[in-house]
């Protein structure tokens, strides 16, 4: 396995989505039912090995084989990912004595897995055994020609003096027209072959026309970043939030490549169909806060934003998600949409003459809306007056194999406080929650549901051998919250947040306030990475499908609020949380 990020991408294929159902309760207690549910699921063989961590590694492996022979129905022996993470836990500690035998076990158990050989190659590379590293990386590449990481490591071992292009060199790199055209064709074919629902939100005819259109824009002077921008539009056209050109961890990601001097030198915000200055940066002598930009370099703002929107990936092309993305990465998106100009000239309302802006001295990207400041962490509980509490859940990124106990402990303690304080009104804020594991989502629902439910209607991914958590009946907790619930949502809500809120909507668990969520009950997730042959552009494509049981909701829209409330520009500038304030006013009525 190349590195931790790649591991996380693999995990995503196994940890997403949901489904609901009802069943009348018998006289059996809920705690007993939940215990029985746990007993019907296969136990983790890795947890069993961890329980015997005092044993030498060979004895743990012997225990593995013994249990597989004698108790194969009791333990889950099909979870390659969990076993791989277990082996990596030793590799990350540089404990090669344990790591290498465990990777050998994985290869013997999953002989057709290219990833197993890749992981062993990494272990031997860390052990400074280049010959064995080459052997295993070579085998992995042979089994999976798309394993570009193995390809790169092999090159580094064989040619240690070979240096990759710097970000600056890549930014100005020009490939041949033939290389670009071949890569555009490859991109289209790989997306159609890899993505399980590439044509759900676009026809095949239109998808192929988009590729031909981008091919017509290629010239002898097209640079790599301009080509990558074209690729963004092709990928965005399929309407999947889990597919994108390159990754943030890649040195050649478009945002990483862009020199600061080429970035847009104002902090701006797209609000209510207006592009407004919120921070002049080093151009305070030329523009002021709240100036409305009508055009940039002669391009009308509305047309510019429309073009940028076509290059932003979003589930089902949901506009609120695209807007939130723009308001975060405007400093790079504007230059790419304008063809990477050296200078920027703007026209603002009330001034007919153009204003030439000074070059940026720092990147003006803003990751979070400062007006939403109730919680500085992913998880927090705030007790307000009048028997009201705010539970902020800005991430479901808590996985059973890693940090899920943190989420569970937080929610358990928070619900205990809510019970002791006799809270009657609970505001659950899932704004900025881009998703994560189904485990925290289901556990939160168990505190809110008043009847049994199924989380997933569909969970499809390669290598699936059994039902995953959420496909069978889940029961509410005995001590669930029984007061009024209010949910705050925004366009940032993605992936698992869509599943969570779809069930909230379908089961009428409370009042929803905010803007259209950036996702819904339908999600194509997971990640398959591939690299275009000539330009080496890295692309991540979704490779699995997860759908919650809220299947009567439309797939073409995000989860809609009961009350549409958004931040105005004055709310933003004055740090007023209009969405939360609206919820509090509803509670006061």
Q: Which residues does each PLM region occupy?
A:
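C-terminal motif of bacterial Sec signal peptides marking the signal peptidase cleavage site
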Residues: 18-19
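Canonical positions in the second alpha-helix
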Residues: 106, 139-140
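Flexible, low-complexity junctional segments that flank or bridge functional domains
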Residues: 159-425, 432-434, 454-456, 526-531, ...
């Amino acid at each position: 396995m190349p590195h931790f990020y790649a591991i996380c991408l693999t995990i995503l294929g196994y940890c997403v989505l949901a489904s609901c159902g009802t069943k009348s309760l018998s006289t059996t207690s809920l705690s007993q039912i939940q215990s029985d549910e746990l007993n019907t699921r296969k136990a983790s063989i890795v947890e069993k090995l961890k329980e015997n961590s005092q044993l030498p590694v060979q004895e743990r492996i012997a225990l593995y084989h013994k249990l597989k022979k004698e108790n194969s129905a009791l333990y889950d022996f099909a979870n390659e990912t969990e076993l791989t993470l277990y082996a990596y836990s030793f590799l990350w500690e540089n404990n090669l004595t344990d790591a290498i035998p465990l990777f050998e076990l994985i290869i013997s158990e999953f002989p057709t897995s290219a990833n197993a050989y890749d992981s062993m190659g990494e272990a031997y590379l860390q052990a400074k055994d280049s010959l064995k590293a080459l052997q295993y990386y070579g085998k992995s590449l042979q089994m999976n020609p798309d394993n570009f990481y193995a390809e790169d490591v092999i090159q580094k071992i064989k040619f240690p003096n070979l240096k990759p292009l710097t970000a600056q060199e890549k930014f100005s790199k020009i490939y041949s027209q033939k290389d670009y055209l071949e890569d555009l064709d490859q991109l289209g074919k790989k997306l159609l072959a890899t993505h399980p629902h590439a044509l759900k939100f676009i026809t095949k005819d239109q998808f192929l026309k988009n590729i031909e259109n981008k091919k017509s824009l290629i010239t002898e002077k097209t640079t790599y970043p301009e080509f990558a921008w074209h690729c963004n539009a092709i990928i965005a056209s399929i309407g999947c939030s889990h597919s994108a050109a390159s990754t943030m961890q890649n040195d050649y990601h478009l945002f990483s490549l862009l020199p600061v001097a080429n970035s847009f030198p104002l902090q701006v915000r797209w609000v209510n169909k207006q592009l407004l200055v919120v921070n002049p940066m080093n151009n305070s002598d030329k523009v002021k806060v709240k100036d409305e930009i009508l055009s940039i370099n002669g391009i009308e703002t509305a047309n510019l934003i429309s073009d940028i929107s076509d290059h932003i990936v979003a589930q089902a092309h949901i506009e609120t998600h695209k807007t939130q993305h723009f308001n975060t990465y405007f400093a790079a998106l504007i230059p790419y949409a304008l063809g990477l100009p050296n200078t920027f000239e703007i026209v603002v309302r009330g001034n007919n003459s153009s204003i030439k802006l000074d070059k940026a001295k720092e990147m003006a990207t803003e990751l979070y809306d400062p007006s939403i400041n109730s919680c500085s962490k992913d998880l927090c509980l705030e007790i307000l007056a009048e028997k009201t509490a705010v539970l902020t859940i800005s991430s479901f990124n808590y996985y059973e194999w890693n940090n899920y106990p943190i989420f569970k402990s937080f929610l358990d303690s928070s619900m205990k406080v809510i019970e002791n304080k006799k809270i009657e009104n609970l505001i659950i804020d899932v704004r900025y929650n881009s998703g994560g594991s189904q485990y925290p989502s289901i556990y939160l629902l168990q505190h809110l549901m008043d009847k049994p439910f199924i989380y997933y209607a569909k969970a499809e991914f390669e290598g699936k051998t059994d039902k995953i958590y959420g496909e069978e009946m889940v029961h509410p907790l005995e001590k669930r919250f029984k007061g009024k619930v209010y949910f705050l949502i925004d366009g940032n809500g993605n992936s698992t947040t869509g599943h969570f809120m779809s069930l909230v909507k379908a089961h009428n668990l409370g009042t929803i306030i905010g803007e259209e969520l950036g996702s819904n009950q339908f999600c194509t997730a997971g990640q398959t990475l591939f690299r275009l042959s000539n330009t080496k552009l890295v692309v991540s494509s979704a490779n699995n499908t997860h759908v919650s049981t809220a299947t009567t909701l439309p797939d073409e829209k995000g989860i809609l609020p009961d009350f549409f409330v958004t931040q105005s520009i004055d709310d933003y500038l004055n740090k007023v949380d209009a969405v939360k304030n609206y919820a509090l006013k509803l509670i006061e009525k």
